[in-house]
C-alpha cells in the first residue's frame, strides 16, 4: 500500500480497505451470477490488525450463500511484510450483493453447491447473518411506525 492510502501514523485508512473489499466482492459476485451487481449491505467489517505503508495486501472473496437475487460474499484481507514474508489476517467483511438485469431490476441467480464442511459452515453462518439483518430491519420499521 502506498503513502496516499495512509494516515499520519503510517496506517492504511480503513476506508481504503473497505473499498478494496467492495471491489473484490463485486468481482466474485459478477463471476458467480454472470450479471451486473450492486452492493446492498456490508456486515461486520472487522479490522483485526493495521495495514502499514509498504505492505503487500491480498484480498480474497468467496460466495458463501445465494438467495433468489442476492448473495453473501465473504472477504478476507491479508497483509504481507515483503521484507520478512510474514502474512497477517488483517480484516474480514461480509457483503450482500444483488444481481441486476439489463433494466436494473433484481434478477435470479444460480445457486451454489456447498460440498465441503467449510462451505456448509459458511452457508449456515451466512443464513444466520441474513436472518439477523432481516429481523433488525423489521424491528426498525416497527419502531418507526410507533414513533
Per-region residue spans from a language model:
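Surface-exposed, Lys/Arg-rich phosphate-binding patches that contact polyanionic backbones
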Residues: 5
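Anion-recognition interface
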Residues: 10
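Conserved G/P- and acidic residue-centered "switch" motifs that form tight phosphate/ATP-binding loops
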Residues: 13
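Small beta-barrel nucleic-acid-binding modules, principally OB-folds
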Residues: 34-52
Amino acid at each position: 500500500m502506498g503513502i496516499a492510502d495512509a494516515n499520519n501514523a503510517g496506517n492504511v485508512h480503513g476506508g481504503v480497505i473497505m473499498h478494496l473489499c467492495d471491489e473484490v466482492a463485486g468481482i466474485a459476485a459478477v463471476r458467480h451470477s454472470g450479471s451486473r451487481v450492486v452492493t446492498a449491505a456490508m456486515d461486520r467489517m472487522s479490522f483485526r490488525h493495521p495495514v502499514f505503508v509498504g505492505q503487500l495486501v491480498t484480498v480474497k472473496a468467496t460466495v458463501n450463500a445465494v438467495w433468489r437475487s442476492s448473495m453473501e460474499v465473504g472477504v478476507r484481507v491479508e497483509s504481507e511484510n515483503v521484507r520478512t514474508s510474514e502474512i497477517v489476517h488483517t480484516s474480514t467483511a461480509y457483503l450482500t450483493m444483488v444481481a441486476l438485469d439489463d433494466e436494473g431490476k433484481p434478477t435470479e441467480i444460480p445457486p451454489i453447491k456447498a460440498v465441503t464442511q467449510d462451505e456448509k459452515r459458511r452457508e449456515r453462518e451466512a443464513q444466520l447473518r441474513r436472518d439477523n439483518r432481516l429481523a433488525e430491519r423489521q424491528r426498525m420499521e416497527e419502531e418507526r411506525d410507533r414513533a
